[in-house]
Amino acid sequence: MRWAIAMSAETLAVRVRGLVKSYGSVRAVRGIDLDIRPGEIFALLGPNGAGKTTTVEILEGYRRRDGGEVSVLGYDPGRDRAKIKPRVGIVLQQTGVDRYLTVSETVQMYASYYPRPRSPDEVIDLVGLGAKRDSRVTTLSGGQIRRLDMAIALAGDPDLLFLDEPTTGFDPSARREAWEVVKNLASLGKTVLLTTHYMDEAQYLADRVAVIAAGRIVAEGPPATLGDRDHAAARIRYRLPDGAIAPSGLTDAPDGNGFVQVASKDVVADLNRLTGWALANSVTLDGLEVTRPSLEDVYLSITGETDASLPGGEPRTRCG
């Protein structure tokens, strides 16, 4: 049995059991368990003060834990940080680089710190800065500097990459470009631990997400099934012509924008009934749409329910 437990820790990129950390009388982390598989993008979500930063800093080896077991790439970051450091890349929210070096000089400098670095030119191309290779950092845009931060983190060819709010302050186009860079990393077999406040970012990038609130993991699973959102009632929304009355059971109170909406547990049957009625009565259903709760809806619901129930224990939701 002990052999099986040891093997599971070695074969996971990150394994956490019963992680605890306090600051004086404040319990920042209260018994967290996490498994992150090699090659996956894992997003850690949670409100400010929930314990995300403390948890990540413990995994990175920058903060000591009070209790629990932590394995990162098969090592304890509290004892073996020197062994982990060459295999880990970190992209912080804010980093400082010499603004008068070129992009190429910057990446080459950081690559020289590692025993087996990735080719600087390859890293620069990977993050989409090939055209800026010989440009000085001072001439780069905010989004390009963020790409450079990522190139620096990749210079040592890490197995595990920590991304802390990687697209904060980006415009929509730059965010999409950054997402593709992260996707490329996963395609190379890199493991990525992402912290973000953007739910669409987690939805697009993450294979699995965990929601942390008040120091505990309160939900975990693929974005599509987190909090059973795939089984939640769908919302059918449409606009009726003046004077038209929809079939009973397929109309709720108007939403205030001239649309009617109804919660549906059987979308196919309800849509068939609604559209059949509309065809039979020559009624146009303007703006007809069907939606399910978004990841943001589920996240707000989960964290709201958790905040209301603390400090008592809350169930942990596992999905997939």
Give residue spans per PLM region.
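Conserved ABC transporter NBD signature motif
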Residues: 68-76, 84
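Conserved ABC ATPase "signature" region
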Residues: 108, 112, 118-133
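Conserved catalytic motifs of ABC-family nucleotide-binding domains
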Residues: 157
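Catalytic Walker B motif of ABC-type/P-loop ATPase nucleotide-binding domains
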Residues: 161-165
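ABC transporter nucleotide-binding domain
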Residues: 178-265
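Short, charged/small-residue-rich alpha-helical element at the C-terminal edge
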Residues: 225, 232-305, 320
